[in-house]
A protein has these predicted regions:
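IMPase-like, lithium-sensitive Mg2+-dependent phosphomonoesterase catalytic core
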Residues: 2-53, 60-62, 73-339
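Alpha-helical scaffold segments that form or flank carboxylate-/histidine-based iron centers
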Residues: 66-69
């Protein structure tokens, strides 16, 4: 009987990757599978969020008799739970937690990875049914194994990432992750309850026709950014356009679209957020890693995102990220300013 080997599940893919590296311990594969499990559980709740909200408003108790939790707190608990009870993660940092957590048990203290994540980015979009996502970033700890992790294990430059990825809860639910060997996308197949390889070896097109920015802040942006945006608005067929502006206010969705189709996403400095809005460690770094492995570029307007050495867990950064050719055109405007 022929076994269908055409479509690999996430588990099969990570095991195949591990087999390609005889010295691999399997810890990273286990960690990615743990994150996939958390994503499946979050997906169930996200898909019925509207219903739960209505029931939750009625009396704070949902149909299962559970206390209605905020969905992003729920998502945080799911990701933290699978990593804490797994065998591959020594500690975590999360958008939902003030400080990092060292799991500090004998198994976890001997794990070689730490993970940072935004458990449910864009959760403000849930009540209007806009796609949202989970973002994660994996590093090898820098302190010796056998002891609890410390802050320096988390404050590493993004270039040290071992893996990074996201889950987008959209028209379908997809998990996309990158290692230095490539970027691969897996679509959740409800018929078997598994993420199945649907987008092997994702490459970000060198040029695209989509620019993503919040036009509501236009007059707060520095002049080179304004100048570049106006160039985008004036592109013609002859100059690589015409461009279209797409911005749905959910980073995972905007960046997933631009990764697949080509495009540029910008979150520049504004008056009330002079250092940018997006978080370096668990929003900018993971996407910068993914986009660079896929052939794109990511900077804060001055330096490569992955080269920034963080000083705080929740520090913010400006972000310009996307297709290599579009980023280089933007950089030609920014360099004039810097010059
Ligand atoms: P603004 C969502 O709140 C988020 O963190 C990202 O997902 C999104 O790209 C950005 O903020 C949108 O911010 O200020 O344009 O609404």
């Amino acid at each position: 009987m022929m076994v269908n080997r055409k479509i690999l599940t996430l588990d099969e893919f990570t095991i195949q990757q591990m087999r390609a590296f005889p010295h691999a311990t399997g810890e990273l594969s286990n960690l990615l599978r743990d994150l996939g499990l958390a994503a499946k559980r979050i997906n169930v709740e996200v898909n019925k969020a509207g219903l739960v909200d209505i029931l939750g408003d009625a009396g704070e108790i949902n149909v299962q008799g559970e206390d209605v939790k905020k969905l992003d707190v729920y998502a945080n608990n799911q990701v933290m739970g699978v990593l804490k009870h797994g065998i591959s993660c020594a500690g975590i940092g999360s958008e939902e937690l003030d400080d990092f957590i060292a799991f500090d048990d004998p198994v976890s203290n001997n794990s070689k990875y730490v993970c940072m994540f935004d458990p449910l980015d864009g959760s403000g979009n849930i009540d209007v049914n806009v796609s949202i996502g989970t973002i994660f970033s994996v590093y090898r700890r820098v302190t010796p194994k056998g002891q609890p992790v410390s802050r320096e294990d988390f404050l590493q430059a993004g270039i040290n990432q071992v893996a990074a990825g996201y889950i987008v809860y959209g028209s379908s639910t997809m998990l996309v992750y990158a290692t230095r060997r490539g970027v691969n996308g897996f679509t959740l197949d409800p018929s078997i309850g598994e993420f199945s390889l649907s987008h092997p070896n994702i490459q970000c097109p060198e040029f695209g026709k989509i620019y993503s920015v919040n036009h509501g802040n236009f007059f707060q942006y520095e002049k080179p950014v304004q100048d570049y945006i106006q160039v985008c608005q004036q592109k013609t067929k002859e100059t690589g356009g015409p461009y279209t502006q797409r911005y749905i206010g959910s980073m995972v969705s905007d960046l997933h679209r631009n990764l697949i189709k080509g495009g540029i996403f910008m979150y520049p400095a504004t008056k009330d957020k002079p250092k940018g809005k997006l978080r370096l460690l668990y929003e900018c770094n993971p996407f910068a890693f993914i986009v660079e492995v896929a052939g794109g570029k990511a900077t804060n307007g001055k330096v490569r995102i992955l080269d920034i050495v963080p000083t705080e867990l929740h520090q913010r950064s400006t972000l310009f990220i996307g297709s290599k050719g579009m980023m280089e055109e933007l950089e030609s405007f920014l360099q004039r300013e810097n010059a």
